[in-house]
């Protein structure tokens, strides 16, 4: 899956237009961030608003993972932990998609954060070169696209093991749409929303298993209104994490924080 609205074929979606009303006298419209924090023993929620769209309270968060539907909608709220960093940008999931504007959108958002970006196409780049780029990166970004193709590439190249090692060393993983889905224990659940390529080479759909929940990006967002409901209906027994195109989940050890941005 990729981050957005329009569909070109089954299991694909495309970048949403930025939400909100017209700007007035050069001032950005107010942005409300709804934040739900869930830990092992407590649950709380609160609302933070910022005219500039920068949530100061979020700047203290340095997560292991950030999983989202559409990175560009979340990027304005990210604090110093995401700014001026070396980013290994993995666009591989979108390699065979007809519409890839969401990849360019994410790349632009990273540049606005002052990132030093290195493109790492794990399906085409020599393994040694890709490994070196990942070892130097402070943040590893997995783009949207086809979840099954991305997982196949990650596992067949054993880049999944390299990513796991980098996270243990303190790197941050950001997964957008398909990039979020592959972090789950097993991605079979997402088939109503995404297609399995004919040349998928793995024996199963075991994911990276970096989180103990199952992200459902683009929940109730066109063109996935019906298919996202099907995922929920078919897998109600799983700990699903529903995210619309303005939501993300930040994972810090046993605690996960869900944030939501909406132009008001």
Predicted regions and their residues:
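Class I SAM-dependent methyltransferase SAM-binding "motif I" and its flanking Rossmann-like core
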Residues: 152-153, 159-221
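Conserved anion/nucleotide-ligand pocket segment
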Residues: 215-246
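A contiguous loop/helix-start segment that scaffolds small-molecule binding in enzyme catalytic cores
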Residues: 239-264
């Amino acid at each position: 899956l990729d981050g957005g609205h329009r569909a070109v074929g089954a299991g694909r979606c495309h970048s949403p237009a930025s939400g909100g009303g017209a700007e007035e006298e050069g001032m950005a419209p107010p942005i409300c961030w709804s934040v739900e924090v869930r830990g092992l023993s407590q649950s709380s929620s609160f609302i933070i608003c910022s005219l500039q769209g920068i949530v100061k309270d979020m700047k203290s968060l340095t997560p292991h993972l950030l999983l989202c539907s559409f990175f560009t909608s979340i990027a304005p709220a990210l604090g110093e932990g995401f700014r001026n960093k070396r980013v290994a940008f993995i666009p591989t999931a979108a390699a065979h998609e007809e519409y890839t504007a969401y990849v360019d959108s994410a790349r632009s958002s990273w540049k606005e954060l002052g990132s030093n970006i290195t493109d790492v196409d794990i399906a085409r780049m020599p393994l040694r070169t890709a490994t070196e780029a990942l070892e130097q990166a402070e943040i590893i970004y997995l783009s949207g696209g086809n979840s099954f193709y991305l997982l196949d590439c990650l596992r067949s190249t054993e880049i999944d093991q390299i990513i796991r090692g980098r996270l243990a060393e303190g790197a941050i993983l950001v997964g957008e749409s398909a990039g979020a889905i592959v972090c789950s224990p097993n991605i079979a659940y997402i088939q109503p929303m995404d297609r399995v390529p004919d040349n998928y080479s793995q024996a199963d759909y075991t994911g990276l298993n970096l989180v103990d929940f199952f992200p459902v990006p683009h929940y109730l967002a066109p063109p996935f209104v019906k298919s996202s409901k099907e995922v929920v209906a078919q897998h109600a027994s799983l700990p699903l994490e529903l995210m619309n195109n303005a939501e993300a989940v930040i994972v810090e050890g046993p605690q996960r924080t869900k944030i939501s941005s909406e132009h008001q």
